[in-house]
Structure formats: structure tokens, C-alpha cells
UniProtKB/Swiss-Prot annotation:
GO terms for biological process: activin receptor signaling pathway; glucose homeostasis; mushroom body development; positive regulation of glycogen catabolic process; positive regulation of imaginal disc growth; positive regulation of neuroblast proliferation; R8 cell fate specification; regulation of imaginal disc-derived wing size. Widely expressed in larval brains. Belongs to the TGF-beta family. Disruption phenotype: Development of larvae with small brains and aberrant photoreceptor axon targeting. Cleaved in vitro by metalloproteases tok and tld to produce a 30 kDa product. It is found in: Secreted. Transmembrane segments: none annotated. Keywords: Cleavage on pair of basic residues, Developmental protein, Disulfide bond, Glycoprotein, Growth factor, Secreted, Signal. Residues 115-142, 174-194, 436-462 are annotated as: Disordered. This is Inhibin beta chain. The keyword Iron does not apply. PROSITE patterns: TGF_BETA_1, TGF_BETA_2.
């Protein structure tokens, strides 16, 4: 090969026989018979100008064309080639970036639920470390730095979404100081790379120039043929390209020399390096934007929907919902059914018939069917066609206060309530912790202070938060003054009682003689025995003594203030007091029916006539046996009411008295006969804020002690007595015969020293009221003798709401209410041991726990308690090898199973079904009050095969 530097210089010898230029180029300098390389020729140094696929035909051009090739054209072509290379690199980088983003977006969505479910099924706690950059390898030093930076803590997570959010927060949310350090470090690295690149380029240019000068020394030598150097066979390489080592070096090195002087090359290289360095950060940024957009949509969907979602699962799957400060759907501690049921299904020891993992914020279709069935079952058992209208219900706090008062100060948790009863008991105790030591304490014993509670400091005393009784600071001194009565007053009272007329005395004796003998003997008991807090006994039907503890069958402990508990009902020898007789004369009560009169009078001693009670019991006993077969189905299906709380309604006005009206509750459930075990009315009695109490507060203690005799002589002994009358609904109170419509029911003595909520027994009145077939309201007239201006009854006085400046008037929350305790005649069966799926064999018929939350069902607005219950269901197989003969309930089932194993009854298979149920207690808002009802067969206790 020969180098020619002059365009006119050419090969002098004859061309090589049968051969042409190896490049098959159309250039004149290359078509002279052998390879003559011209340095300034573009076609000899640029591969793109050579037509390697062209034909071997020669197109000779005149020699003058070589002179027209200028240096400017060479520079333009080289710059054009450099621009094409830079654009190709940019296009490649952009295509790679878009492809990676699309692939990550496609593969991140389907794998999200699977990864989350696998992470939850495998383990609950995963220790996560901060991820390093793509170019950084994990090491002990980097882990130590990260631990020092973020603390020695581990994050407990249950799905992969939390890991992504934590990684993105650490990658994208850096502090300003770290960003500044990163920018400074990046600038230093850029300067160092630029300096190294310029030095390396300078060395390369020097090496190329030295090699080029060495090749110029052989310019006069002739070019040897390719056959002699390499032994080329043209039969094998026709139309192909063969490169020698010298040709490659000659083709590449001058191109670099030409491209190097172009100043734009350095800028393009720097831009490409920046793209490569920032490619990882840009990819993470795009992934974060796509991921955050999806999660924001999911958060909005969860927070705006009314579907069955749980607080725990929304916290796991949606981090931004809690970081943004928006309120969640469920914020209490109750456990919605989705959380417990999903955890119970996929974390039990039994691996039989497990379903595929479902998203945590949704409910499986099978669970939705169960929930709808449970809702229909509850409404049907309550005798309702739809959810009750609770647009304006009573406040739940007021309801719990009422239940607490009914309980008598101690809340007994029901097993059906679970943990909610315990929490409720603690909350109610805390609510009453603010009662001051000097305030009047109410212990649910009809205005008395239990001596057991005085001796035992552990006995819980409480005061209702609605009790705003005015408290005198010097109550001890004032109490001593009022209690110190002279003996002369007692003698005067006895002489006054003995001075009655003979007619009145005979009339009173005849009235008392008409009462049972046991009741008279009870009235003759000493006052010390009644005041000592001993066990008070009431004579039963057959002469046997019945204790007050016989009422312990109630859900709550009952201690009623019976009228026989007070000595003040009788005179000196057991006869009626003078004030009582005058009270009857004032009302002009006329009773033409003797039996009816005695029945009403006997309620004073809480002892009805013996023959009437025996007749009612025999009649009820006979009717219970007659209707036993008919009531079996109703008792097993409909709810069994145990307790009813009915608030008084404001009736008409009669003189200065307000009539109380109560609605019956026995019409809610079809074919259900309520049997009243006991009934009490709760009435609140307080002291008003009168002027003489204010003056008594300001009097010094010495002045009160000096004027003790004067107070005792002028101030009479105040006694409070409550009278209860029933008004007949068939007669209008505006008629002249109003006295005939009033029936006396009972009277009760109240101790003025212990005021507040009082409980009075009205069992006979309520039994007679519920015994009527018609659904008439109970109308009661309540009066107080001895109250005057000192004490007041809370009936229907309106008062402004506390803490509200508006003039809105609401009904007094201290209005009276009735508490009815019903009894159930259903027999209890012995409970057998149930097999849970947690400890059952593989495929065995077992009981699966299934929790139902009323809040998740949207029923927390009308169901007061409980917050939820375990409905449970059965699953498993009854045809496994574990089925032994003793597991069959009947011989017929065993016989059918043997035939099925023989192949004679292939179409029949036994099913795993519930065989034992239990009831659930429910307290809810009724149309007329608060009702507690036991719903039978609501909880699956045992599963088995037939």
C-alpha cells in the first residue's frame, strides 16, 4: 500500500491483474489498480462514503474533481456525523427511561396484593432497613450510619405498600443540609471528571500524532498486494468487507483527529454523563408519582365509601389517609368483623378449605351473604320489618346513666357483651368519681344509706351526675339541731293519737283487720329492727317467709323501698296515722267495690290478697301448660325480653298535678306474653334553692347551738310521703266523676336525709296493667305530702340546656321512668363441648369464629349494647376418616353412612351444620323506650354431623 499526498500522483505500474480496489469505491484515487491511500481524500478515510454493497462497475471521474474537494466540506461532514451520534445517544437514553417506567407501572399493580398477602401470611413483623442507591453496595459501615441516623428501631408492617412508602419518604424527602452537601459533592466530582477527561484526551492526541508521523516515513514505499500479505481468496469474500489491522488503525485515528477540534463534543459528553447519573433518581421519581397517585385514589375511595371497612386495614393499606389528618371511619376499639375474620381464617392451625387471600379493605362474598342473613334474622326476631326510626334518640350517655341507676350503683357485665361490659363498668365508675364527700349519696335503697356500705369502705357509693342537691357546708351542726327533739313532742303526739274519736278509731281498726294477719304482725315489729338494716321479710302465699333476696333472679340487683319498710305507715299500735286519713279525706276517694278497695289497700304493705294470688298463679300455671307446645317455637325463634325501661310521657294537667303516662311494650313481638317478675318506678326528689337554706349557710355555728331549743319548738318534724294513684283511661278527667276514676295504688315513706333517686315498687299495678288485652297507656298521678316548698319532685319541668346560651328548652332528663323485669319459663339445656377449627383435624367438621360488628353494619345508631357478637358458622367435611361410630347422633345416620360407603347412595352426603345455639342479649332503642331483649339461637356454639 502506498501513501500519496499529491492528487496528481498515481500508480505508475500496471494495475493488478483481475483485481480492482478492495473497497470497490467509486473514487478516482482508489480505482488505479492498487490501493492508493490519499490523506486528504474523504472517501479513503470515511467508511460511510464507501459503497460496500455496490457493484464492481467503475465510474471514472476526471482528475479535476479531486481538486474541488475542500477542507470546509470535510469539516461539515464530520460535524454532521457527530451530531447524528449525539442525537442517537439521546434517543437511546429517552427510550430506555420510558421503557423502564412503563414496565414498572405494569408490573407493580398486579403484584401489589400478592406481595401484601404473602407478607401477611408468612410473618407479622418485618425488620426493614433503608435501601441504598443502585450504585452502592450494602456494607456494615453503611448499615451503622443508617442506624445512627434513623435510630435503632424496627418497623412492624404487614404488607409491601408500607415498605414502598417508607423507602420513598427516605429517598425523596431529604433535608436541606443533605441536599446542599450532595450538590457540592456533585460539583467537585464534575470538576475532577472534566480535568481527567481533558488530560486523557491530550495524551491520546499526542499518541495519534506520533503514530501518524511514523507512518509518513513510509510514503515512498510501494503498496504490496493483499494476496501476498493475507492470502485473500476472492471466491470466498466476493462482495464482503475485510479489514486489516493497519486499515482499522488508519480509519479510526484520523477521524478522532478530525472530531476532536469540534468544541460541541465536550458539552454533549457532559450531558450524556449527567443523564446516566440522574437516570436512577428520575426513575424513582416517576415510580413515586405513579404510586402516590394510585394510593391517593384508594384513600379517597376508602374514606368516602360506606362499605364495610376496618380501621386497622385502612391504616395498613393507606398511609396517607392518617398522615393527612382526616378522620377515619372507625376510631373506637371495637373490632369490626373484617379484621377479626380475615385474621382468623388465614392464621388458624387448620389448613382445610382455605380461600384465596382477598384484599383487606373488602369483604368476601360469602361473608356478605352471612351478614345480610344475620341482619334479617335479628330484625325478624325483634318483630321488626325494618330498622327503627331513631332520628331523635335519647343521648347514649343519658341511657347509660339510667341503666346505672336501675342497677343500683353496680353494673353487672353480661357475658353476651364481652369486654364492652367491663369497659362500661369502668367508665361509669369514673364518671361518678367527682361526687364530693359532703354530697348526698344515693345507694339505690329507696332513700336509705346501707349500713353495710358504711361499715365496709370498699362498698361503692355514687351520686348521679344529674343530682344537683344543694349542700350545706355546716350540715353536721344543722343535722344535730334537727334531730334533737324533746320528749315532750313525742308525748304530745301520742296523746293526740289517743284522743281521736271512737268512730275513726273503729273505722281504722276495721280497715286493718281486713288486712292479712301476717301483715299486722309485721307492723308490730320494733323500730330498732327496721332501722338496723336487718333482712326484711315478707310473708309469702302459704305462710312461708319470703326474703328480699328472692328478687335476685333479676339481671340487676334489686332493693325496692316497699311501703312496709317504714314504721311511719302506722300509728302507735299499728293503726293508720292521722295525716294519712286526712289525705284520703282530701281526695274523697270512694271505693264501692270492697274487693277492689282491699286490693288497692293491700298494695301499701306490698301484700295482695291471698286468694287472688293463688287464683292468678293457678290460672297462669294452667295456661302455661296449655300453651307450652305453642310457645316452644316462639321462644326458640323470637327474642325473650328480660328488662324494659320506659320513660314517662307528659300527660294532661289535673288541678296542680301533672299526670304521667307510660306506653305498653307487649305489642312489639307477635304471639309473646310478657310475665312481669317485678316493676319499679324511679322518681327523683331534691331540695330547691330556697332562701332559708341560704340564710342557714351564713349563720355561725355558735348561734345555731344557742338557738337549738327555739328551732326545735318552732320547726315541725318534716316527713315526706309519696302517694301513687292510677287514673282510668275510659273516663275523661274533665267530668264531674273524676274521683271515681282515681284508684289509690300505693304510698311510700322517704327519708329527708337521703334524697335523690328513689325506687318504689309497683309490681301489682304493672301486672294488672299488662294483664289487659287492650293496649292502653298507664296513667299515674303522683303527689307528695310534706314536700311543700322544701322539697320538689322532678316530673316534667323544663330547663335550659347546660353550656348553651340559646333559649332552647328541653325536657327534664330527671323525669320518672319504669323498669320492668320479665321472667323466662324456657328450660336451659346442658351445654356440650364444641370443636373449634383452630384445634380440629384436617377437614373435620368444626366451628369457625365469625365476629359481627353493629357499627360496621350501620346499626350503632339504634343498638345500644353490645357493640358486636360472635355469630360463628360451621365448616368442614362429615365423610372423612375421622368419623367414628360414636360421633353419629342416631343409629339411622350411622346406617345411612354405611350404605353410602358401599356406593348405594352416592347422591347423599352428610353436611356439617350447627347443632347447639345460644342466645344474645340486646339493648336497643324501641319506638316507646329502651328495651333489653334476649334473642335465641343467635350464636353457634357447637357444630356436628347428623
Amino acid at each position: 500500500m502506498r501513501f500519496a499526498f499529491d492528487s496528481n500522483h498515481s500508480q505508475s505500474g500496471a494495475p493488478f491483474k483481475g483485481s480492482r480496489c478492495f473497497f470497490n469505491c467509486q473514487c478516482i484515487c482508489c480505482r488505479q489498480g492498487c490501493c492508493v491511500v490519499v490523506v486528504k481524500c474523504c472517501c479513503c478515510f470515511n467508511l460511510n462514503c464507501c459503497n460496500s454493497l455496490g457493484s464492481r462497475k467503475s465510474f471514472p471521474q476526471p482528475a479535476a474533481m479531486r481538486k474541488k474537494v475542500a477542507d470546509l466540506e470535510v469539516l461539515r461532514v464530520s460535524r454532521f456525523v457527530a451530531v447524528i451520534l449525539v442525537l442517537a445517544r439521546w434517543v437511546t437514553a429517552v427510550a430506555t427511561l420510558l421503557t423502564s417506567c412503563i414496565l414498572l407501572d405494569i408490573f407493580s399493580v398486579p403484584g401489589q396484593s400478592g406481595v401484601a398477602d404473602r407478607s401477611q401470611a408468612s410473618s407479622r413483623t418485618v425488620h426493614v432497613s433503608v435501601p441504598t442507591t443502585p450504585n452502592e453496595t450494602p456494607s456494615s459501615t453503611s448499615e451503622t450510619k443508617l442506624k445512627l441516623l434513623y435510630g435503632y428501631t424496627s418497623y412492624d408492617i404487614n404488607n409491601d405498600q408500607q415498605v414502598k412508602s417508607n423507602n420513598l419518604c427516605r429517598v425523596l424527602c431529604k433535608s436541606r443540609n443533605r441536599k446542599r452537601q450532595r450538590r457540592r459533592r456533585r460539583r467537585r466530582n464534575h470538576r475532577r471528571r472534566r480535568h481527567r477527561y481533558t488530560k486523557r484526551l491530550h495524551h491520546l492526541m499526542q499518541d495519534n500524532m506520533s503514530g501518524f508521523e511514523q507512518r509518513l516515513n513510509f510514503s515512498d514505499a510501494k503498496c504490496q498486494s493483499l494476496e501476498t500479505n493475507y492470502g485473500t481468496n476472492y471466491d470466498l469474500v466476493q462482495g464482503g468487507k475485510l479489514f486489516s489491522q493497519s486499515e482499522r488503525s488508519l480509519l479510526v485515528s484520523p477521524l478522532r483527529e478530525i472530531e476532536a477540534p469540534w468544541p460541541a463534543i465536550h458539552g454533549s459528553m457532559r450531558n450524556c454523563s449527567k443523564i446516566k447519573r440522574n437516570r436512577a433518581n428520575l426513575i424513582w421519581l416517576l415510580i413515586g408519582l405513579v404510586w402516590f397517585e394510585v394510593k391517593l385514589i384508594n384513600c379517597n375511595g376508602i374514606s368516602s365509601s360506606n362499605y364495610y371497612a376496618s380501621n386497622l386495614e385502612s391504616h395498613k393499606g393507606c398511609t396517607l389517609c392518617h398522615e393527612s389528618g382526616k378522620p377515619n371511619i372507625y376510631t373506637d376499639k371495637d373490632n369490626p368483623h373484617t379484621d377479626y375474620n380475615i385474621y382468623n381464617k388465614y392464621h388458624s392451625n387448620n389448613n382445610f378449605n382455605k380461600k384465596t387471600n382477598q384484599p383487606h379493605n373488602n369483604i368476601a362474598p360469602s361473608d356478605e351473604v352471612r351478614l345480610e342473613s344475620i341482619k334479617r334474622q335479628i330484625l325478624t326476631k325483634l318483630g321488626l320489618s325494618h330498622k327503627p326510626n331513631v332520628s331523635h334518640p335519647l343521648p347514649k350517655q343519658f341511657i347509660w346513666e339510667t341503666i346505672y341507676r336501675v342497677d343500683g350503683g353496680r353494673m353487672i357485665p353480661n357475658n353476651a357483651f364481652g369486654s364492652s361490659g367491663k369497659n362500661l363498668d369502668q367508665k361509669t365508675i369514673k364518671l361518678r368519681a367527682f361526687a364530693s364527700p359532703g354530697s348526698h349519696l344515693f345507694n339505690g335503697r329507696g332513700g336509705r344509706t346501707d349500713q353495710r356500705s358504711e361499715r365496709d369502705p370498699s362498698h361503692h357509693k355514687y351520686r348521679s351526675p344529674f343530682d344537683f342537691t344543694f349542700n350545706i357546708s355546716k350540715n353536721n351542726v344543722y343535722g344535730k339541731v334537727l334531730r334533737n327533739r324533746s320528749l315532750e313532742r313525742i308525748d304530745k303526739k301520742n296523746s293526740f293519737l289517743n284522743g281521736w274519736t271512737e268512730n275513726r278509731q273503729l273505722k281504722i281498726n276495721s280497715q286493718i283487720a281486713s288486712m292479712p294477719i301476717e301483715l299486722k304482725s309485721h307492723h308490730n315489729s320494733s323500730p330498732k329492727e327496721l332501722k338496723s338494716g336487718a333482712v326484711r321479710k315478707v310473708n309469702g302465699i302459704n305462710g312461708t317467709q319470703m326474703n328480699e333476696n328472692a328478687l335476685k333472679k333479676s339481671t340487676y340487683p334489686i332493693d325496692i323501698n316497699h311501703s312496709i319498710d317504714n314504721k311511719t305507715h302506722t300509728g302507735k299500735n299499728g293503726e293508720m296515722s292521722h295525716n294519712d286519713y286526712e289525705y284520703f279525706n282530701d281526695y274523697s276517694v270512694q271505693t264501692h267495690d270492697k274487693n277492689r278497695y282491699h286490693e288497692g289497700r293491700s298494695s301499701i304493705g306490698y301484700q295482695p290478697a291471698i286468694h287472688n294470688i293463688e287464683y292468678e298463679n293457678q290460672k297462669g300455671h294452667h295456661e302455661s301448660f296449655a300453651d307450652d307446645h305453642e310457645n316452644i317455637d316462639h321462644e326458640d325463634f323470637f327474642g325473650n325480653t328480660q328488662e324494659i325501661i320506659t320513660f314517662a310521657e307528659e300527660g294532661t294537667q289535673y288541678r296542680q298535678y301533672r299526670i304521667l303516662e307510660f306506653s305498653a311494650q307487649n305489642r312489639r313481638v307477635p304471639s309473646q306474653k310478657l310475665s312481669i317478675r317485678s316493676a319499679q318506678i324511679h322518681i327523683r326528689i331534691d331540695k330547691p334553692h330556697s332562701l332559708w337554706i341560704e340564710k342557714a349557710k351564713s349563720l355561725p355555728e355558735k348561734h345555731l347551738l344557742n338557738t337549738k331549743r327555739k328551732w326545735g319548738a318552732n320547726k315541725p318534724h318534716h316527713r315526706i310521703k309519696i302517694w301513687v294513684f292510677q287514673l282510668s283511661t275510659s273516663i275523661n278527667i274533665t267530668e264531674k266523676g273524676i274521683d271515681k276514676a282515681i284508684i289509690f295504688r300505693a304510698s311510700f315513706q322517704v327519708d329527708p336525709k337521703n334524697l335523690g333517686w328513689q325506687k318504689f315498687d309497683l309490681t301489682d299495678t304493672i301486672r294488672e296493667w299488662y294483664g289487659h288485652t287492650s293496649h292502653e297507656k298507664l296513667r299515674l298521678l303522683i303527689d307528695c305530702t310534706g314536700c311543700g316548698g322544701r322539697y320538689s319532685l322532678h316530673l316534667f319541668q323544663t330547663s335550659k340546656l347546660r353550656g348553651n346560651s340559646s333559649d332552647y328548652l328541653s325536657t327534664n332528663p330527671n323525669r320518672p321512668f319504669l323498669v320492668l323485669h320479665t321472667e323466662s319459663s324456657r328450660t336451659r339445656r346442658v351445654r356440650r363441648r364444641a370443636v373449634d377449627c383452630g384445634g380440629a383435624l384436617n377437614g373435620q367438621c368444626c366451628k369457625e369464629s365469625f365476629y359481627v360488628s353493629f357499627k360496621a353494619l350501620g346499626w350503632d345508631d339504634w343498638i345500644i349494647a353490645p357493640r358486636g357478637y360472635f355469630a360463628n358458622y360451621c365448616r368442614g367435611d362429615c365423610t372423612g376418616s375421622f368419623r367414628t361410630p360414636d360421633t353419629f347422633q342416631t343409629f339411622h345416620a350411622h346406617f345411612i353412612e354405611e350404605y353410602r360407603k358401599m356406593g348405594l347412595m352416592n347422591g347423599m352426603r352428610p353436611c356439617c351444620a350447627p347443632i347447639k345455639f345460644s342466645s344474645m342479649s340486646l339493648i336497643y332503642y324501641g319506638d316507646d323506650g329502651i328495651i333489653k331483649r334476649d334473642l335465641p339461637k343467635m350464636v353457634v356454639d357447637e357444630c356436628g354431623c347428623p
